[in-house]
Amino acid sequence: MRILALIPVFALAACETMMQPVSATGPAPGAGVTPAAAGTPAPTLNPNPPPPPPVAARTVDQFDTTSDADKAAALAVDDTAPVKDLGTTLATLGPPAEPGIWLKTPLVSALTMGVVSYKGKDAKMELRPSGGEAGSGSQISLAAMQTLGIPLTEIAEVSVSVE
């Protein structure tokens, strides 16, 4: 009978261990991970890249600093220019704080201009090397997703080519 009386005591003692903050039981989340330098722009081919979004940005419109003129220029794809097909990749939304119209992909090894196609719609954009293994997927910018009409939550299959 006395043993039954001790069961709640042991159960509550176990709860206390579970309620300790993470810093008391192990390293902080993300410890050992070096974040990218804040305010360091990604390499770009655009001589006049869009400005970074405001620090307090919370909405899609606040994060998307690419001008309507830049989006229209991206859609002006020359259908007569010869292209080299690089293949297809699955693309998800990349860091929304990185402005511009770009695709980070393992299909290229150097920064270059290319054409990305999604459901019959083409857009010129920067192809940035992701450093990933072939088949590892790609990240696409917020502005590029909006330009191509890709829903922001979609894992989109896109075709990639270079001129």
Segments predicted by a language model, with ranges:
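Sec-dependent signal peptide recognition
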Residues: 1-8
